[in-house]
Amino acid sequence: MNTIEHRLMELEAKVAFQDETIDILNDEIKVHQQLLAKMKRQTELLAEKIKESQSSSSMMSNEPEPPPPHY
């Protein structure tokens, strides 16, 4: 086998390895994107619940809370 053929085989092997690595990384990115979307939705739901909780608690009593007993 001459040098050019050997170098060509090495390059083909490297390209094949890089293609496999790219496929693995793409799969990992998909998983992370799905997880990020899920976390974003959970954050939005929690923000909505906090707003609802704050608005319902402010509606329940318009008077300021009395100071704690130790004052």
UniProtKB/Swiss-Prot annotation:
Disulfide bonds: none annotated. Belongs to the SlyX family. Residues 49-71 are annotated as: Disordered. Coiled coil: none annotated. The gene is slyX. HAMAP family: SlyX. It holds the Pfam family SlyX. This is Protein SlyX homolog. InterPro entries: SlyX.
